[in-house]
Amino acid sequence: MIPALFAIIMMLMTGYLPALNIVSEKEAGTIEQINVTPVNKWVFILAKLIPYWARAMFVVTICLLLAWVVYGITPVGNIALIYLLSLLLSLFFSSFGLIISNYSDNMQQSMLIMWFFVVILIQLSGLFTPSRSMPSVVYITTYINPVSYFIDAMRTVFIRGGNFNSIAHQVLALALIGLFMGTWAVMSYKKNR
């Protein structure tokens, strides 16, 4: 359960804060100043995402230390794989938060939309109940749920001591979903409104 809780912490750190980022600038009126600069929107979105990725890696370090100090649990597998998985999940959630922020008009709307999707992603990820016990129609959704890939891979690395080959499928899925969402975040940002 401890490795799977990393997913919830990653959602909170890298999902909610970016969801509030651009929409707070819209409310304050500072987005107009950014829009008139000659900065490419890829650079702008990347500049918005990098601080959340760095913060996420710091939080993963704190979580690993707390798991060791409080519960006496240390990862059996490679710690670098844990950081790789966490980085890929933070790519997804920070991009998803920026997508929501791009489409939202105010902070309340952004938070409610993010909350709606986070609850669904957690419930359908296999964190609390095994994915195999879900009805087949619902089980299909785990193939597009990055949290389920993250939890499976974290359990494999953290508890079973799996190597990169044992989680290559999950890493590839997280990378593809994260890149898709990152591209969507850039494309959904409109400099001219």
Language-model features and meaning:
Residues 23, 99, 103, 158, ...:
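Junction motif at the cytosolic side of a transmembrane helix
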Residues 35, 39, 104-105, 129, ...:
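Short helix-loop-helix connector
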Residues 74, 125-180:
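Membrane-interfacial helix-loop-helix junctions in multi-pass membrane proteins
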